[in-house]
Every structure is written in structure tokens, then in C-alpha cells.
Amino acid sequence: MPKRTLNIVESAYRAVIEEQDDTILWLLAAMQGAGAQHTVVLRGNAVCYAVAGQGAPSLTVGEWKQTHAPKMDKDVLDLLEKRKIPVFVLEEDLVPRGLTRDMLVPGVELMSRAALPSIFEQHAVVSLW
């Protein structure tokens, strides 16, 4: 049986315009397809990934235009619905960003910082991204 891995995603929006997704969320989806077992905790600026309906404008450099902007909320929904990967958001990181629970995609669970040690115990590996 594969080891269960807890993935805490904190560094947000790196390479998302170039890649059209978050590299870690993409990697977790691919690994889940190969049989790995993951749980995701979004913290810091990465809590914004779970905001429903968010988007990013396209990027133009000279005459080149990036027309496939990332849709991070769709990536989170893919993890939840298609990949069956549990996704948590640290509730203490919502308020400083002006976010509320009702702004998040359905299925994302709130977690307090105080609950982190208990979720650590449920996983063989903990990675901070």
C-alpha cells in the first residue's frame, strides 16, 4: 500500500502563467493517477487557489500572447472531484486576504492551524511547497 503524503502548498502562483497550472497541484494529480495517496493543505497565498471563479488575465509580451490563463479553482476542483484528493484551507489565512468560506469552491474543508499536528500524524510523509 502506498504511503500517504501530506502536501502543504504555501508558495502560490509561481510559473502559473507559463504552465497554466500550479506545478505542485499538477504533479499531485499525475501521481494520484499512478496510485499515490495525497492530502493537500493550502496555506498563505495559496488559499486563493480555492476561491471559486477566480481567473487571471492573459499575458502579452511583444506580439506573443498567452491566451490560456490558469484557472486555479478548476485545478482544486479536479483534485477534489476527479482525483478524490482531500483539500484543506487554513482558515486563519483567509481573513487577512479578505476571503470568507462562502467564496471557496465546494468540497474544500477548513482547518485551523491548531489541527495541523493531528493531520501530520495521519501521513507518512509531509512536504512543504
Predicted regions and their residues:
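Short, glycine-rich nucleotide/cofactor-binding loops
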Residues: 6-22, 44, 48-50, 68
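Short, basic, glycine/proline-bearing loop/turn elements
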Residues: 9-14, 58-65, 99-102
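Histidine-anchored nucleotide/phosphate-binding helix
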Residues: 19-40
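Short amphipathic alpha-helical segments and helix-helix/interface helices
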Residues: 25-29, 74-78, 116-117
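Anion (oxyanion) recognition and catalysis
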Residues: 32, 81, 120-121
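Short internal beta-strands
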Residues: 37-44, 87-91
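A glycine-rich helix N-cap at a beta->alpha junction
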Residues: 58-91
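N-terminal glycine-rich phosphate/adenylate-binding segment common to multiple enzyme folds
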Residues: 87-129
